[in-house]
Amino acid sequence: FEADVLWYTEIPGLTVRGQFAWSDATNTGDFITPGGENLKGSERSYSPEIAGSFGISYDASLTDGWRYNFSTDARYSDDYGWGVYIDSPRQDSFWINDVSLSLYSEDGQHSFNLIGRNLGDEIVIVTGGAVPGRISTQTGTSALIQDQAVTTQQGRTFTLQYKYKM
């Protein structure tokens, strides 16, 4: 189930947005891993049960010919397994917060932007798996989760940006 909302409020320039998703992603068929496990009936990898976001933007005139926009968003993800095995390692649930401030010309030719992403510096696993070329000294599931490598999203970032459109 998914739902999206975009509300143009009665306050000029203020918009509110939100998204919500509920998922019950389960391996319904036979799926045999390299370690011999059948994942049938287990939770799918990288599939949080609940995810969503909430944000607001405010856009207004600053001076003759110039406008500003302030925007902030908070995104939530429930915990999820990041391996392809039964009882795989899990990424804990998390919140990510972003903010931006823009000063731009009404004709759209110039814009100055300050963008902050992942302000809480939340390090989140986005993918993971066995390290290629490693030979385990054990067998079964424990061998599969011995030597794992993960990819994470970026931590806190700030960007100062200028755009010019011809």
What do these predicted ranges mean?
Residues 1-82, 161-165:
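Gram-negative outer-membrane beta-barrel transporters
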Residues 29-39, 87-92, 128-137:
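Flexible, surface-exposed loop regions and adjacent strand-edge segments
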Residues 50, 66, 95, 110, ...:
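Exposed loop/turn and edge beta-strand positions of beta-sandwich/beta-sheet ligand-binding modules
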